[in-house]
Amino acid sequence: MGSSPILLVLAISIGLASACFLNSCPYRRYGRTIRCSSCGIENEGVCISEGRCCTNEECFMSTECSYSAVCPELFCKIGHHPGYCMKKGYCCTQGGCQTSAMC
């Protein structure tokens, strides 16, 4: 019985270690059919349009994103601002990113 809590903690740790984030998942995980280029500090974002990089927290201008590296496939809106679905339920616009039922 003493090993049950240890096994539970081990299983949770493995689950968390194998989780992926916006740019660390295999590119087909979110329905994308092209590989997106990484951008931003520590390559934590993806190029959503030419000259535009989005991370989990914000979108910004970036010279790292060329036309051949962009990844917009699913479009969404937050208010009146157009954006891109970065993952299921998550929309990024020029003003930032937030949850969205459109994605």
Curated annotation (Swiss-Prot):
UniProt modified residues of type Tyrosine amide: Y30
GO molecular function: neurohypophyseal hormone activity
Keywords carried by this UniProt record: Amidation, Behavior, Disulfide bond, Neuropeptide, Secreted, Signal
Pro-peptide positions on chain: 31-103
This protein's GO CC annotations: extracellular region
Disruption phenotype: Viable and fertile. Gustatory associative learning in response to salt cues is disrupted. Males have reduced reproductive success, due to a range of aberrant mating behaviors.
Name of the protein in its database record: Nematocin
Protein species of origin: Caenorhabditis elegans
